Each structure stands twice: as structure tokens, then as C-alpha cells.
Amino acid sequence: MTHVTEPVVNSAPKPMTPLQEFWHYFKRNKGAVVGMVYVVLMLIIAIGANVLAPHAPAEQFRDALLRPPVWQEGGSWQFILGTDDVGRDVLSRLMYGARLSLLVGCLVVALSLVLGVIFGLLAGYFGGVVDVLIMRIVDIMLALPSLLLALVLVAVFGPSIVNASLALTFVALPHYVRLTRAAVLVEVNRDYVTASRVAGASSARQMFVNILPNCLAPLIVQASLGFSNAILDMAALGFLGMGAQPPTPEWGTMLSDVLQFAQSAWWVVTFPGVAILLTVLAFNLMGDGLRDALDPKLKQ
């Protein structure tokens, strides 16, 4: 008696969800994963600074002025990264400074992204006079150095963390306008937009419901890179005395306050500088990974 073996049919692999597909391509970029881990760590530190920081950011220890880090001769576990010229704990101020830097980055990116998307949609969808007017203003703004323009705005309205954030929002706005407009011009003549227009969809529905979701990928990447630019520019404004004012624990202001001690007490300038460097680098690496994961051309 012969046995007939039935052929085994392998089932097709289950398609990945959008989130699974995103993570599949994102994790290929090891630098992006490292950057994301660092950003998550910074978020935890910023949120839990009240609990994690060993001291208050403005607390002064007059008997421990310019105390070196714990691993250097004269250091103490009470001040792991040393103290500054008035006896404030460097580690605690770095932790609270992370909160302020990330908060400013969120504010600048959120405001510039929302306004840039609105103006970019208007320019790309309506075209004509609206497009010419918006894009000529954008061209004028881009013709000026961004940091110089921010400095002028802060000088006019007065140095403060709020005015510096609004100035950085203003100088970041043109990049989102141009990017949104370019993406809209690609989508506006596609069949689904034409069909929706024939069906009687309003201009607002066309822009914000039909077109905008298909333009989000490059905007997400730009927002990630804009986050690092906002942190770096805020540190530059703080260093020049036009951002956060002492004794606010902001990384750029920390550098400016102790610059005269750079040679005698290296730690007071090194650690804030390293914090700025690593944070900006982490957001840039993460933005590179987001581009790899969201750009269809790079997936092929």
C-alpha cells in the first residue's frame, strides 16, 4: 500500500504593520538607535531632575568653590562632576539644564512646524499670488544668517528665554514652509486629490485631511533635525547673554558664566560643552535614522 504525501504549502509571510515596518528600517541604522537611546535617557533625566539631581541647581556651597570632579585629587562624592565658581553642583545644573534645553527644543519645533505647515499648505495648494507672496518672504528670511537674525530679534525685544525661543521659532519657520510646499506640489495633482475635489471637498479638507498626511515623512525628519538646531542655537544665545539669564541652569549660560575659569577649572566648561555636543549629535543621528525609515527611496 502506497502512501501519497501531500505537498506542504508555505503560507505567505504576514505583512508588517506600519509601526513594525518603521522599526525594521530604523534599527538598521545603529547610530540612530544609539541616538534614540541617548534622547530617551535625556528625557528621563529632564523629567526626573527633581528626584535624580543631588542638589538644587541654585544651591551654593561656599566652602566648596571650584571643587574638582570626584576622580580628581580634591574631589568629593558630594559633587560628582565638581562645582562652579560660586559653589553650585555642576551635575545638578546639567540635569536641570537638560529640562530647559529639551523644553525649548519642543517649543521651537512645535511652533515652527505648525506655522510652517499652514503657510506651506497655503502656498502649495493655492499657488498664484499667495504662493509668490509667501515664498518671497521666505526667501528674504533665508537670505539672512539665522543666528544673526535671532540675535537682532532678541536684542529688540529684550534678552529672555521666552524671547529667545520665539526668535528661534521665527528663524526656523522658512525651512518648514519650503519643505511643506515642495511636498504639497507633488501631491496636489494626484488622482485622489482630483477625485476629492470633484466630490466637492472643501479646500481646508483637501489640505489638512487629504494632502497633509502624505507630506508628514519629510516633516518628521526635519523636526528631528530642527530639534538639535534649536538646542544648539539656544545654547549660543545663552552663551552670548541673549538667552536664559543667570542663575537659570541653561547649558549655554553655564558656559558663559565660567569662561574665565576655563584653564584653571576645566570641568566647569567641559561638561556643559559635552552635554551640548552629545545632545545635538544624538538628535542628528536619530534624524538620519528617521529619514532612512520614512523615505521610500532609501528602503529599496
Which residue stretches match the model-derived regions?
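Transmembrane alpha-helical segments of polytopic membrane transport and secretion proteins
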Residues: 1-37, 285-300
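Short linear motifs in intrinsically disordered
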Residues: 14, 68-72, 228
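Residues marking the start of alpha-helices
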Residues: 22, 77-79, 153
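Conserved beta-strand positions that form and line the central face of beta-propeller blades
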Residues: 25, 65, 79-80, 89, ...
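Short, strongly hydrophobic transmembrane alpha-helices
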Residues: 31-50, 117, 277
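Hydrophobic alpha-helical transmembrane segments of membrane transport/permease proteins
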Residues: 37, 45-83, 240-248
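Alpha-helical transmembrane segments of integral membrane proteins
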Residues: 83-300
